[in-house]
Amino acid sequence: MKASEFVEALKEINVRNDLLKKQGVSDQSIEDRKSSYLAAYKGGGSVSQYPLVELVENYDCSNLEIGMITFDERIEEKGRFIFFGRFEVDDLAVDLITGSVVMLECGLDHILYDCAQNDSSFLEVILNTAVFLEKRSVEEGLYENEELNIQRAEGFGNIAGGEKYHDFYKMMLGV
């Protein structure tokens, strides 16, 4: 998935105002949630073999948040990694040797999780994860359905490249 495709697809995520209001979510929180799926084009036209580099360099990702995933203001290349974002406090990066996306312990080169076989599949899978998380936040019983959440996490891992990636998405969904 290309950065531009990812940004356009995020705009299509259905934030259910009516159901969120029924849950007592404030109008401001609903607007904040909607803006967490928006990344405005900031120009520059950076071209890279890595869609994640194009995303961070060409779009304002300051409000973009998918689950616990956030994006940095700029790309930083250090050693064998291109750092592009965070999962909570830990670093998300593209491994320049393998091309895979990994989660590294904050400030260290220690890989905690393998996230995707490449950054294109990472964009595709976190888009799918965002859609599911949004649905799970408003549909009765979906959050508590551990079996379904495990199935979804494994499905997301398969989109990311296979069984090697299941653990990251299980952790992301809290199962």
Question: What are the language-model segments listed below?
Answer:
Residues 44-148:
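Long, low-complexity, intrinsically disordered segments enriched in glycines and aromatic residues
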